[in-house]
Every structure is written in C-alpha cells, then in structure tokens.
C-alpha cells in the first residue's frame, strides 16, 4: 500500500507517481507526482513536465473547479504510465508541481482507499 501525502495536502491525500512519455520522440519524465482525485472528471498534467518532453500544447478549453471557478487550459497528447498500464490520450495542463489523475483514468482501475490509515492501493 502507498502512503497518503501530508506534505502537500491538508488533510492528507492519496498521491501516486507516474511516467509521462512523448509518443512522438520517446522522451520520458519519471516519478511525476499525481493526486488521485475521484472528484475530478479529467486528468491534468503539470505543464513543466510537458515542456520538458517538448510537447506542443494544442486545443484550449474552459475548466470549472469544484467551487465553479473557471480557468483556461490547453491540452497535450501523451502516454501516461501508471502502475504498469499505459493510458494514451489528450490531457489538460495545469500550472502546479503535481498533476491530478481523474476518473477518465481511475475508472479503469480497482482502487482501495484507506483514509483512516492514510494508505491506498490498486487491487
């Protein structure tokens, strides 16, 4: 089981690490921190890693947060590798040091969250 992260989040939250890969040139960035967020419809990737992978942002969308604040986000196409599974797709960019894995990926996995003990795992 993996520990929740209490350094970035209060209260502590489930944080995973992933690998991001540019599908065109094969460049990879490893150990990217990603919040596991069952309340998020979509997955968001930290913009700094997309830049390091030489990815070109394409379409722009308006996003709404849980409190209905609106923001604009561009997308990139890449491979996100999480727990040995590769998810190919178009992902939103976020300007922070961690990303968010939303239900567009989480719904393909069998996860267990143990909030009391601040642990999570894939079954």
Predicted regions: what they are:
Residues 1-123:
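Pepsin/retropepsin-fold aspartyl endopeptidases
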């Amino acid at each position: 089981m993996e520990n929740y992260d209490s350094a970035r989040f209060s209260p502590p939250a489930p944080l995973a690490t992933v690998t991001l890969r540019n599908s065109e040139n094969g460049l990879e960035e490893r150990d990217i921190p990603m919040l596991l967020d069952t309340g998020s419809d979509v997955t968001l990737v930290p913009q700094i890693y997309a830049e390091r992978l030489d990815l070109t942002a394409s379409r722009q969308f308006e996003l709404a947060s849980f409190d209905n604040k609106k923001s604009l986000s561009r997308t990139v196409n890449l491979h996100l590798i999480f727990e040995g599974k590769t998810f190919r797709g178009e992902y939103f960019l976020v300007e922070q040091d961690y990303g968010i894995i939303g239900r567009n990926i989480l719904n393909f996995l069998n996860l267990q969250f143990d909030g009391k003990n601040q642990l999570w795992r894939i079954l």
